[in-house]
Amino acid sequence: MAKETQLQVEAIKNGTVIDHIPAQIGIKVLKLFDMHNSSQRVTIGLNLPSSALGHKDLLKIENVFINEEQASKLALYAPHATVNQIENYEVVKKLALELPEKINNVFECPNSNCISHNEPVESSFKVFEKKEEIRLKCKYCEKVFSREIVTER
Protein backbone atom coordinates (compact mmCIF):
# COMPACT_ATOMS: atom_id res chain seq x y z
CA MET A 1 0.00 0.00 0.00
CA ALA A 2 1.47 3.35 -1.05
CA LYS A 3 1.91 5.94 1.66
CA GLU A 4 -0.29 8.93 0.90
CA THR A 5 1.16 12.37 1.55
CA GLN A 6 -0.51 15.71 1.22
CA LEU A 7 1.06 19.15 1.13
CA GLN A 8 0.27 21.07 4.30
CA VAL A 9 1.00 24.37 2.55
CA GLU A 10 -0.26 25.05 -0.99
CA ALA A 11 2.25 25.03 -3.88
CA ILE A 12 3.10 28.30 -5.63
CA LYS A 13 3.44 28.84 -9.38
CA ASN A 14 6.30 31.39 -9.30
CA GLY A 15 8.35 32.79 -6.45
CA THR A 16 10.53 31.73 -3.55
CA VAL A 17 10.14 28.97 -0.98
CA ILE A 18 12.23 29.18 2.20
CA ASP A 19 12.04 25.83 3.97
CA HIS A 20 13.66 24.28 7.04
CA ILE A 21 13.59 27.51 9.02
CA PRO A 22 13.92 26.67 12.72
CA ALA A 23 10.57 26.91 14.52
CA GLN A 24 9.83 30.38 15.95
CA ILE A 25 12.13 32.09 13.41
CA GLY A 26 9.76 32.36 10.41
CA ILE A 27 8.19 35.65 11.51
CA LYS A 28 11.65 37.19 12.01
CA VAL A 29 12.63 36.16 8.48
CA LEU A 30 9.36 37.61 7.18
CA LYS A 31 10.23 40.96 8.80
CA LEU A 32 13.90 40.81 7.75
CA PHE A 33 12.86 40.86 4.10
CA ASP A 34 9.91 43.20 4.74
CA MET A 35 7.59 40.55 3.27
CA HIS A 36 4.80 41.46 5.67
CA ASN A 37 4.43 44.73 3.72
CA SER A 38 4.43 43.05 0.30
CA SER A 39 1.45 43.19 -2.02
CA GLN A 40 2.30 39.64 -3.15
CA ARG A 41 0.73 36.58 -1.57
CA VAL A 42 2.84 35.20 1.28
CA THR A 43 2.06 31.78 2.74
CA ILE A 44 3.42 31.10 6.20
CA GLY A 45 3.71 27.71 7.84
CA LEU A 46 4.63 27.81 11.52
CA ASN A 47 5.59 24.84 13.70
CA LEU A 48 5.13 22.33 10.88
CA PRO A 49 6.29 18.77 11.58
CA SER A 50 9.84 18.04 10.43
CA SER A 51 11.75 14.78 10.65
CA ALA A 52 15.08 16.65 10.80
CA LEU A 53 14.14 19.53 13.12
CA GLY A 54 11.14 18.23 15.03
CA HIS A 55 9.26 21.39 14.04
CA LYS A 56 10.04 23.98 11.38
CA ASP A 57 8.72 27.15 9.80
CA LEU A 58 8.20 27.66 6.06
CA LEU A 59 7.64 30.74 3.89
CA LYS A 60 6.32 30.86 0.33
CA ILE A 61 6.41 34.23 -1.42
CA GLU A 62 4.73 34.48 -4.79
CA ASN A 63 6.37 36.43 -7.62
CA VAL A 64 9.35 37.46 -5.46
CA PHE A 65 12.83 36.02 -5.93
CA ILE A 66 15.43 36.31 -3.17
CA ASN A 67 18.93 37.16 -4.39
CA GLU A 68 22.29 35.87 -3.11
CA GLU A 69 22.83 38.88 -0.81
CA GLN A 70 19.44 38.38 0.83
CA ALA A 71 20.17 34.66 1.18
CA SER A 72 23.37 35.45 3.08
CA LYS A 73 21.37 37.60 5.53
CA LEU A 74 18.97 34.70 5.95
CA ALA A 75 21.95 32.51 6.95
CA LEU A 76 22.25 34.54 10.17
CA TYR A 77 18.77 33.44 11.25
CA ALA A 78 18.53 30.01 9.68
CA PRO A 79 21.93 28.72 8.49
CA HIS A 80 20.49 25.35 7.39
CA ALA A 81 17.38 26.66 5.63
CA THR A 82 16.81 25.86 1.97
CA VAL A 83 15.86 28.54 -0.54
CA ASN A 84 14.19 27.35 -3.74
CA GLN A 85 13.20 29.54 -6.65
CA ILE A 86 10.04 28.28 -8.32
CA GLU A 87 8.90 28.83 -11.90
CA ASN A 88 5.74 27.21 -13.25
CA TYR A 89 5.49 25.02 -10.11
CA GLU A 90 9.02 23.61 -10.62
CA VAL A 91 12.22 24.27 -8.64
CA VAL A 92 14.54 26.03 -11.11
CA LYS A 93 17.26 27.17 -8.70
CA LYS A 94 18.43 26.34 -5.19
CA LEU A 95 20.37 29.03 -3.35
CA ALA A 96 23.17 27.91 -1.05
CA LEU A 97 23.24 29.82 2.21
CA GLU A 98 26.61 31.19 3.24
CA LEU A 99 27.32 33.48 6.15
CA PRO A 100 28.27 36.95 4.92
CA GLU A 101 31.68 38.31 5.94
CA LYS A 102 29.99 41.45 7.18
CA ILE A 103 26.51 42.85 7.43
CA ASN A 104 25.67 46.55 7.28
CA ASN A 105 22.65 48.58 8.30
CA VAL A 106 20.45 45.63 9.28
CA PHE A 107 20.88 45.29 13.05
CA GLU A 108 21.50 47.70 15.92
CA CYS A 109 24.49 47.19 18.16
CA PRO A 110 23.33 45.74 21.50
CA ASN A 111 25.93 47.84 23.33
CA SER A 112 24.00 50.93 24.46
CA ASN A 113 27.30 52.85 24.78
CA CYS A 114 28.27 52.20 21.15
CA ILE A 115 28.81 55.33 19.07
CA SER A 116 26.50 53.91 16.39
CA HIS A 117 23.52 54.89 18.57
CA ASN A 118 24.38 58.59 18.73
CA GLU A 119 26.12 59.28 15.43
CA PRO A 120 24.69 59.21 11.89
CA VAL A 121 26.53 56.03 10.87
CA GLU A 122 25.28 52.72 9.49
CA SER A 123 25.65 49.77 11.81
CA SER A 124 28.29 47.32 10.67
CA PHE A 125 29.22 43.88 11.97
CA LYS A 126 31.91 41.40 11.02
CA VAL A 127 30.41 37.90 10.97
CA PHE A 128 32.37 34.81 12.00
CA GLU A 129 31.93 31.38 13.53
CA LYS A 130 33.59 30.27 16.75
CA LYS A 131 33.02 26.71 18.00
CA GLU A 132 30.03 26.40 15.61
CA GLU A 133 28.42 29.51 17.13
CA ILE A 134 27.73 32.49 14.89
CA ARG A 135 29.23 35.69 16.32
CA LEU A 136 29.02 39.31 15.23
CA LYS A 137 31.65 41.94 16.03
CA CYS A 138 30.61 45.59 15.94
CA LYS A 139 32.81 47.75 13.72
CA TYR A 140 32.63 50.70 16.13
CA CYS A 141 32.77 49.42 19.71
CA GLU A 142 34.51 46.15 18.70
CA LYS A 143 32.39 44.12 21.11
CA VAL A 144 31.50 40.57 20.08
CA PHE A 145 27.94 39.29 20.42
CA SER A 146 26.18 36.00 19.78
CA ARG A 147 23.85 35.91 16.79
CA GLU A 148 20.84 35.57 19.09
CA ILE A 149 21.62 38.77 21.00
CA VAL A 150 21.99 40.85 17.83
CA THR A 151 19.02 39.40 15.92
CA GLU A 152 16.61 39.63 18.89
CA ARG A 153 16.70 43.42 18.89
Swiss-Prot record:
Pfam family, one: PyrI_C
Cofactor info, note text: Binds 1 zinc ion per subunit.
UniProt-listed InterPro entries: Asp_carbamoyltransf_reg_N (IPR020545), Asp_carbamoylTrfase_reg (IPR002801), Asp_carbamoyltrfase_reg_C (IPR020542), Asp_carbatrfase_reg_C_sf (IPR036792), Asp_carbatrfase_reg_N_sf (IPR036793)
GO biological process: 'de novo' pyrimidine nucleobase biosynthetic process; pyrimidine nucleotide biosynthetic process
A GO term, aspect molecular function: metal ion binding
Positions annotated to bind Zn(2+): 109, 114, 138, 141
Signal peptide: none
Cell inner membrane keyword on record: no
One Gene Ontology CC term in the entry: aspartate carbamoyltransferase complex
Cofactor: Zn(2+)
UniProtKB keywords: Metal-binding, Pyrimidine biosynthesis, Zinc
Subunit structure: Contains catalytic and regulatory chains.
Role summary: Involved in allosteric regulation of aspartate carbamoyltransferase.
NCBIfam families to which the protein is assigned, alphabetical: ATCase_reg
Family (UniProt): Belongs to the PyrI family.
Protein name: Aspartate carbamoyltransferase regulatory chain
Gene for this chain: pyrI
